[in-house]
Design a protein with these regions (language model features):
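N-terminal interaction modules that seed assembly of large macromolecular complexes
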Residues: 2-5, 18-75
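Acidic, proline/glycine-rich low-complexity IDRs
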Residues: 4, 110-113, 121-177
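A ubiquitous short alpha-helical element
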Residues: 9-13, 110-115
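Short secondary-structure junctions and interdomain/linker hinges
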Residues: 31, 35, 58, 94-98, ...
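Short, charged/polar, low-complexity loop and linker segments
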Residues: 98-110, 135
Length: 177
């Protein structure tokens, strides 16, 4: 783990993560709108990979401890049903994939997942932290992004990245598919 960050370091780091989050959310929304009909899978792969770089940075720093014991209200959660539905329609031929739930467990479970559901979950977690950041609660935003990276959006993003990479690899290595 790294040394503790100063408040200035945390603010700079929070801005960097917020920029990555904003970029990811904008790209996913653009894909869902149909802005890249011929390249949506490679674009999503690139965006999820970039996001995981930020997640790795969050995982590498010491635990961020919020100023308050209880999380401040970040406002209503975004309604991502339309985004999920548009992504599901776009990804229909490749949306469903299999994932090993916990590869370190002695008895691994294989789950059936949907890329569209996982992307919507990731967007919800990221938007929640972004609401804190926009309200000036930098430590709270970083705490949320770090906690949810480790517990929710990080595992989902890793699974989606593997699924998207598999789709890209199959399309390039086996052109008959």
């Amino acid at each position: 783990m790294s040394e503790p960050m100063t408040s200035d370091d945390l603010e700079d780091f929070g801005t960097e993560i917020a920029d990555q989050v904003t970029s990811f959310l904008m790209a996913v929304r653009a894909v869902a709108r149909g802005d890249a009909p011929d390249s949506y899978v490679p674009i999503l792969l690139l965006e999820i990979s970039q996001l995981l770089l930020g997640g790795g940075r969050l995982g590498a720093i010491r635990d961020v401890v919020p100023d308050e014991r209880f999380e401040s209200d970040a406002g209503p959660d975004p309604d991502l049903d339309e985004l999920r539905e548009k992504l599901a329609a776009l990804l229909k031929p490749v949306n469903t994939y299999k994932e090993v739930f916990d590869p370190l467990a002695t008895k691994s479970e294989i789950e059936t997942r949907r890329i569209s559901d996982d992307l919507a979950l990731i967007c919800a977690d990221l938007a929640h932290g972004l609401a804190h950041h926009r309200d000036g609660r930098i430590t709270e935003a970083l705490w949320w992004w770090q906690f949810s990276y480790l517990s929710s959006w990080g595992p989902a993003a890793s699974a989606v990245m593997r699924a998207l990479q598999s789709i890209v690899a199959r399309s390039r290595l086996d052109p008959t598919r």
